[in-house]
Amino acid sequence: MGFYMLLTVALLLTSFMSVEATPVDQAERSAMKESGLAHRIEPRYASCEAAEADCIHDDCFSEDTYTDVCQESCQYMYDNCMDD
């Protein structure tokens, strides 16, 4: 009898662990929009051309001069400007 109680408790605990946090994330995002915090976060680049100018700069091709700006601009291009 004790084994079945332990098994039931274990199954209940594992079922609670598989709950997704999507509704919580959506609630947080809507709260941020209502409070105005979402509008304060602006992307670094307004266009792909600006990101491309930073990404293909000569400094970004050298390991010694590669900076966070190079990383951010090339990542922006990869995420937003590449054709599928």
Swiss-Prot record:
| Signal peptide start and end residues | 1-21
Tissues in which the UniProt entry reports expression:
Expressed by the venom duct.
Q: Does the keyword Metal-binding apply?
A: no
The molecular function terms in GO held by this entry are:
toxin activity
Keyword set, alphabetical order:
Disulfide bond, Neurotoxin, Secreted, Signal, Toxin
- Could you tell me where this protein is found in the cell? Secreted
> What disulfide bonds does the UniProt entry report for this chain?
C48-C70, C55-C74, C60-C81
* Entry keyword Magnesium: no
Principal subcellular localization:
secreted
Residues that make up the propeptide are: 22-39
Q: Name a single GO cellular component.
A: extracellular region
What is stated about domains? The cysteine framework is IX (C-C-C-C-C-C).
Stated name of the protein: Turripeptide IX-01
Q: Which organism is it from?
A: Gemmula speciosa
